[in-house]
Amino acid sequence: MTTDVIADMLTRIRNANQRYLKTVSVPSSKVKLEIARILKEEGFISDFTVEGDVKKTINIELKYQGKTRVIQGLKKISKPGLRVYAQANEIPQVLNGLGISIVSTSQGIMTGKKARLANAGGEVLAFIW
């Protein structure tokens, strides 16, 4: 049993991406579904589906451009031992706008750019580039 389910999801995606796998399965939760939705909206993954009745899993289809990975890196920022919070004007940019930050706000989980536009701060979950 893992204590940080978001880090587990990011690690599974990173490992599958390094092996050039087409799909990766992740145990489902509301937070993970929101992160997968953001990754699809931003073009980092092709698609995702939810399967199963009792134990639902999210099947994420990774995206490649020829032999090049679309996801170059993933980094978990806020950890169970050290939570990282940022106000709306302090949400960091990733690689000068080439990547995204995922932020958990009072209005839901969204990208750092949308959080800045909504003037909502929160917990910085991850960086993806």
Swiss-Prot record:
The keyword RNA-binding applies. Signal peptide: none annotated. GO terms for molecular function: rRNA binding; structural constituent of ribosome. One of the primary rRNA binding proteins, it binds directly to 16S rRNA central domain where it helps coordinate assembly of the platform of the 30S subunit. Belongs to the universal ribosomal protein uS8 family. Gene3D superfamilies: 3.30.1370.30, 3.30.1490.10. The gene is rpsH. This is Small ribosomal subunit protein uS8. InterPro entries: Ribosomal_uS8 (IPR000630), Ribosomal_uS8_CS (IPR047863), Ribosomal_uS8_sf (IPR035987). Pfam families: Ribosomal_S8. The lineage of its organism: Bacteria, Bacillati, Mycoplasmatota, Mollicutes, Mycoplasmataceae. Keywords: Ribonucleoprotein, Ribosomal protein, RNA-binding, rRNA-binding. HAMAP family: Ribosomal_uS8_B. GO terms for cellular component: ribonucleoprotein complex; ribosome. One of its GO terms (biological process) is translation. It comes from the Bacteria. Part of the 30S ribosomal subunit. Contacts proteins S5 and S12.
